[in-house]
Amino acid sequence: MDVTRLLLATLLVFLCFFTVYSHLPPEEKLRDDRSLRSNSSVNLLDFPSVSIVALNKKSKQISRKEAEKKRSSKKEASMKKVAQPRTPLSAPCVATRDSCKPPAPACCDPCASCQCRFFRSACSCRVLSLNC
């Protein structure tokens, strides 16, 4: 009985050994210095060629005009965001970052909302969106 267990154990060890080493990639054997040099050097023909094109004055002016248009549109968008009126604050409210457990009133900031963590044991008013 002990001999069969010993044989089964060695068979199991050899099977594990062969399965592990059969999945590993075979190692490359370098026979001389020439193969070492060819494997280590980078072949420049493998990379695509790069062409350098000089910009003429028209394309530079167009790109400057486009950049100015983008800047002006960003400024207009920021001006529109600032011009939006805020709703008046109600008297019974919770300030931002203060505790707002469910029986408490709503948050003072219209962009803030009450966020609860740890199974509604720790709640606080937080601003979720910066664009509000």
UniProtKB/Swiss-Prot annotation:
Subcellular location: Secreted
Compositional bias per record (Basic and acidic residues), positions renumbered to this chain: 63-79
InterPro entries assigned to the protein according to its UniProt record, in alphabetical order: Agouti, Agouti_dom, Agouti_dom_sf
GO BP, one annotated term: hormone-mediated signaling pathway
Primary localisation category: secreted
Domain Agouti: 93-132
Known function: Involved in the regulation of melanogenesis. The binding of ASP to MC1R precludes alpha-MSH initiated signaling and thus blocks production of cAMP, leading to a down-regulation of eumelanogenesis (brown/black pigment) and thus increasing synthesis of pheomelanin (yellow/red pigment).
Protein known as: Agouti-signaling protein
Gene of this entry: ASIP
